[in-house]
């Protein structure tokens, strides 16, 4: 399936090789089980090997065959997708890989049902000394998720950038994740809510020594407006100072800034929220994408 998507071919080739290797290893491990009859070893073998997105596609040896294919044809209202952590090593390819998978699921059911993506929350060690974590892969993975929500029919996302644990890939507090998914569904699927999705940057423009970001609705700043960074003429990132006024956020901190970013780290500082009662967080942003 992914071989049909040129941007994902390299990813597909690597995953195909990995799948073949896993099949060989599985045969060896099964033989070992028969000899040892060790329950502890059996339990370890049953552990998920990483939950890469391709295992959910419709190829051989995939999770699709045992867990999704049996229910194809049954009524479906939508899907919730909370995956992607194991794909962080190829964040740009993720939009093509997951995008192709969503299309294949839609084709199997014969309908473009809602596909709600949980944009991944914060994870890994904080690096407060860095204005921008330029080599971080999770911000780019979150950006790919946003691209899918914008470009794949039926896809949409919830933003969870203010949640997460440094040392636990699964946030302990699950309630906000579920609530935000519900808000998105109520707005996009059931049409009973006006603002269920996170605020989005509509426009970013340099005005003198500042960058002005215009969001799609009024926002407010918490946490002293932290999380913004500006790229100076020397190509160095510096912390930005942010002020909100209605739907605009003005960021200053360096003369004639070249670019602006927000929440661009694996575990970023965050401050931008919708001004409504639900106070939904805005996701990561970069002006250079």
Which residues does each PLM region occupy?
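Cell-envelope and extracellular/periplasmic
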Residues: 1-289
